[in-house]
């Protein structure tokens, strides 16, 4: 049974719905297989090489179907598939006329076969032998017994095997339907697999020149993509297939797949097509039972989900040996080899199914992977450009736009290596260092985790803390204590010559970090060798301007909004003293050279009378 010309039409009109796959792509999947179609293939393919007759045992009974079914099932399981074989039940009444036509064709083929044997024409014998093949009820029962002894599930459909397979995919009991009949799509199977045979894997892997001619390329057709590509609803697709030609009713003469598609697109249903087409050009059959055919596709006779029993059982080894060796005269060595492969294949199927379960959750489409790769590459390039000193605009604080000038790179003498020294934070926790890089700062860009250019990305140790073992994880931060208490919200970073003390009434937001840096050495700077946190820092809502780090021109971490410049967090609103912008503009380009390599801008809310830069020894006057 099938739909005339459907596969070729889909390949032309909806190419994205059809793709060639490897048998490994079905690893861990449950596949519902049309058993009658498989047996038909085995009986045709496995024949005596001399007279193209069926393989038989000593009693003359055909064994081609048993040999083929056992071999293919083991091969599929070795590749990680879990097959379910579905057998045909009684044929539907609508198919009666089609079965009569098939009987007439078979009778004619038998006459031609007899004539070819008399003439000794081997080519004609081979051709007509395939046309006379018929799967008997006895062969079906033998196949069911073999599968049961192998521990493979068997489902007996009340009517058509294709429709039952399709509904197993609808019940989510199977991933796909494996059959050569395209009408499984019309019954609603989600995925249709064609050419699922023991040679498919080798054809896909080796791609030898004869594989495609022999039809060994494994093909997958996706129903959702078919409907999307054809731009049809499911009901329109069913009517389109009926017009193309099915086994349930006759067709309108003169209408092929292309004409049928155009008519469905224009009129949407067979009823409207019959009303509007030219009756002289297109001959509608007098007994055109398209309504019944449509109902057979939409509401086929199938087992409901609760009545479907799929049992994966352990193989019955002794009974299987007796069935093959005693009843059908299979070679004992060959049978032993098959059984050993079967037992190993069952383990492979279980293991690969579990692997597939875990990997399926993280699998990404090719398109998504490409987009992420391009985005990541773009981010890396932008980050490197910023680190190399390209001009950037500082965020606007609401009063004036802050700009930093590019200065020439100057060589800086290396500072003496700092000693590792732990100091206890105000909250009782000691931290040797943390970059506090939990969030990206728009002002300076995120650190590229994939970049290994240490010379560019690691400035002089005079300006950044030494890293400790704790930097590999997130450092725990406590919330700010009540206003008026000493600063407890930030982390303290230890430097060899610096020491931090917190003044009274100093307020930090919960994200603030107190950086202790090397002493600058200004004569008039208070507490030489130490940095103090100014008291009574002005407040703006919950945003606080306080900590003046004179040593390295750090403006005490101002968390306002989400905009950040360097390590100074600047947001919107007039939240700084009037002299902040002027001070920043006057002194921005006098920042230390190593910091300017990173294109950082530092703001000084309170300018000391005389502050001397580390290397240039130039004074910065009060704003």
Curated annotation (Swiss-Prot):
Residues 350-358 are annotated as: Interaction with PCNA. Residues 502-517 have a biased composition (Polar residues). Coiled coil: none annotated. Structure-specific nuclease with 5'-flap endonuclease and 5'-3' exonuclease activities involved in DNA replication and repair. During DNA replication, cleaves the 5'-overhanging flap structure that is generated by displacement synthesis when DNA polymerase encounters the 5'-end of a downstream Okazaki fragment. It enters the flap from the 5'-end and then tracks to cleave the flap base, leaving a nick for ligation. Also involved in the long patch base excision repair (LP-BER) pathway, by cleaving within the apurinic/apyrimidinic (AP) site-terminated flap. Residues 1-106 are annotated as: N-domain. Belongs to the XPG/RAD2 endonuclease family. FEN1 subfamily. Residues 124-267 are annotated as: I-domain. The gene is FEN1. This is Flap endonuclease 1. It comes from Plasmodium vivax (strain Salvador I). DNA binds at residues 47, 72, 160, 245, 247. Keywords: DNA damage, DNA repair, DNA replication, Endonuclease, Exonuclease, Hydrolase, Magnesium, Metal-binding, Mitochondrion, Nuclease, Nucleus, Phosphoprotein. It is an enzyme of class 3 (hydrolase). Its EC number is 3.1.-.-. Interacts with PCNA. Three molecules of FEN1 bind to one PCNA trimer with each molecule binding to one PCNA monomer. PCNA stimulates the nuclease activity without altering cleavage specificity. Its cofactor is Mg(2+).
